[in-house]
């Protein structure tokens, strides 16, 4: 079941360096929220705080709260591994496990969790590949290496792998930046279908993509050179692109900087 995310007063650090500062927002369930802003403003850092991946970076730490349907993901008794099962992630470049078959790529998380019997794996793998709009393209070569697929197919394989463990939230960090236009369109169409089942957050440098796929858009920017990134504005996507409330948002969208 898709879940709502409430973030309050969140700051993230790399050692003594504060990367983002005092971010508060709500991400609605069964919707797509896009993060836009210039390079280095903390979009991807913030995205990684939502499933505690930021802590994997040496010196990475977080202050503030991230509530997933009222459960604080940063409570001391919450296991980060459990968080990452609940909040899945798709990275910028397709990263199928190179030595694994297509089938094993999708089944990897299920086997790691030990949550399915071997007899159930076939059905779950097929369901996940269908959910990623990839089944018809690979059903006759499931035992072939996932690395042999095209770039767009590899990214959809990674999405299938992410949704196989049934997360409630799906984070996407520039999922189309390494893909050609046709593959990008396939991923964008897939995002529109997946939001019926998941809460989706996407980081993108492509403002046209944000306008096409998202329901709400958040604009991030640096407070000043050398200062932490901050959330400048979040609103319905149509409003952000047609009548933003903050001048800096309009300047960025119109290409005056960034």
Curated annotation (Swiss-Prot):
SUPFAM superfamilies in the cross-refs: P-loop containing nucleoside triphosphate hydrolases
GO cellular component: plasma membrane
Gene Ontology molecular functions: ATP binding; ATP hydrolysis activity; ATPase-coupled phosphate ion transmembrane transporter activity
SMART domains named in the record: AAA
Main location: membrane
Annotated disulfide bonds: none
Pfam family, any one: ABC_tran
Enzyme class: translocase
Enzyme Commission code(s) on record: 7.3.2.1
Classification via InterPro entries: AAA+_ATPase, ABC_transporter-like_ATP-bd, ABC_transporter-like_CS, P-loop_NTPase, PstB-like
Superkingdom, taxonomy of origin: Bacteria
Keywords: ATP-binding, Cell membrane, Membrane, Nucleotide-binding, Phosphate transport, Translocase, Transport
Subunit structure: The complex is composed of two ATP-binding proteins (PstB), two transmembrane proteins (PstC and PstA) and a solute-binding protein (PstS).
PANTHER family from the UniProt entry: ABC TRANSPORTER I FAMILY MEMBER 17 (PTHR43423:SF1)
Name of the protein in its database record: Phosphate import ATP-binding protein PstB
């Amino acid at each position: 079941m898709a879940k709502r995310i409430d973030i309050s007063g969140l700051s993230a650090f790399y050692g003594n360096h504060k990367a983002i500062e005092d971010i508060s927002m709500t991400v609605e369930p069964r919707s797509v929220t896009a993060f836009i802003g210039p390079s280095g403003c903390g979009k991807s850092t913030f995205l990684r705080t939502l499933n505690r991946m930021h802590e994997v970076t040496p010196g990475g730490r977080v202050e503030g709260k991230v509530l997933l349907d009222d459960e604080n993901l940063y409570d001391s008794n919450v296991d980060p591994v459990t968080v990452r099962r609940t909040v899945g992630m798709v990275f910028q470049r397709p990263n199928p496990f190179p030595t694994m078959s297509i089938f094993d790529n999708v089944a990897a998380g299920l086997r790691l969790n030990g949550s399915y019997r071997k007899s159930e794996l076939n059905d779950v793998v097929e369901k996940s590949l269908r959910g990623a709009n990839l089944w018809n393209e690979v059903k006759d070569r499931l035992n072939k290496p996932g690395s042999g697929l095209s770039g767009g197919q590899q990214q959809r394989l990674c999405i299938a792998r992410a949704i196989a463990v049934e997360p409630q939230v799906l984070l996407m960090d520039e999922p189309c930046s390494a893909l050609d236009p046709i593959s990008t369109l396939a991923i964008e169409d897939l995002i529109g279908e997946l939001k019926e089942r998941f809460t989706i957050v996407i980081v993108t440098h492509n403002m046209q993509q944000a306008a096409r796929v998202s329901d709400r858009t958040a604009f991030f920017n640096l407070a000043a050179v050398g200062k932490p990134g901050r959330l400048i504005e979040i609103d319905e996507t149509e409003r952000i692109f047609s009548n933003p409330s903050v001048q800096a948002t309009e300047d960025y969208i119109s290409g005056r900087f960034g």
